[in-house]
Amino acid sequence: MKLREIAYSRSGDKGEVSNVCVFVHDAADYERLAETLTADVVREHFGGLVKGPVTRYEIPTAHGLNFVLERALDGGVSMTLRVDPHGKAFQSLVLDIDL
């Protein structure tokens, strides 16, 4: 099962840091999400796109998780040559994770 089957996501950026929030559609799936979607799983999934650590923050009242991806944007919007300088694609890519 892909993460996209039980959740949706949003992403944002600040400098060369990107964050990706994942929220379950049904609150009953939050516990499963929190158990399986670790910072290590996200880091491994993004591979070489994220050059720094990945930190996970739990948002239980909103049934979501926030992942902070350090050194993920090659210097940030004004410096990177990436096609996606704001890191918006991370929100779609994270949903491809197998649970």
Where are these regions (language model features)?
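Long, contiguous binding/interaction regions
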Residues: M1-L99
